């Protein structure tokens, strides 16, 4: 035991405790973003919610994912582009044929015959389209895609689109008469123009969509703006009662 200090002697002051470091709070987790853009969710796109029963669905202001199906010469790319350009809300248009032709060297042209290479490049293009669509939708931008989807060919079927975009994708078939697609095909140039026999064969296979339950628009006698307005009507019904596919 240390000796007591003599009378009148004050003990030395106790030094103050060293300051404690400020508590470090972890920064809030950044959203899944690239710059200020939201990346698509890991899951597929869900079906758009129908508005209350008392109000009619308005496809012109709803964020949608649409797949416009049709044979060569059906006008699906022209209609999809017009529809996207004239909506009052942000809307993107993605044509699978355009994406497939991003491959410059080594492009597997389906006109040269359907083989493993053309199938692989088709699958890749479809997957790329699906990711792009989900990316647009994640940022509040609707998307319309167009592709010649065959009802009798699993690899070129709706299943792949459903996997890559999601069950919220709304498919619509554009199917004018054979004489119309032959006439439109004759106006094409480059590798987008097909032989008449091939156009007729594709058109015949597309007839398999009848009875599928998907909405079908016969635009044989319709111009592009009228077809786009009819597409809005079809989509309004699809939002209210989504087709089973």
Identify the function of each model-found stretch.
Residues 73:
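Walker A (P-loop) phosphate-binding loop of P-loop NTPases
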Residues 81-124:
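Conserved substrate/cofactor phosphate-moiety recognition/catalytic segment
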Residues 165-209:
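A glycine- and Lys/Arg-enriched "phosphate-lid" helix/loop adjacent to the NTP-binding pocket
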Residues 190-230, 242-245:
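Small-molecule kinase domains that catalyze NTP-dependent phosphoryl transfer to phosphate-bearing small molecules
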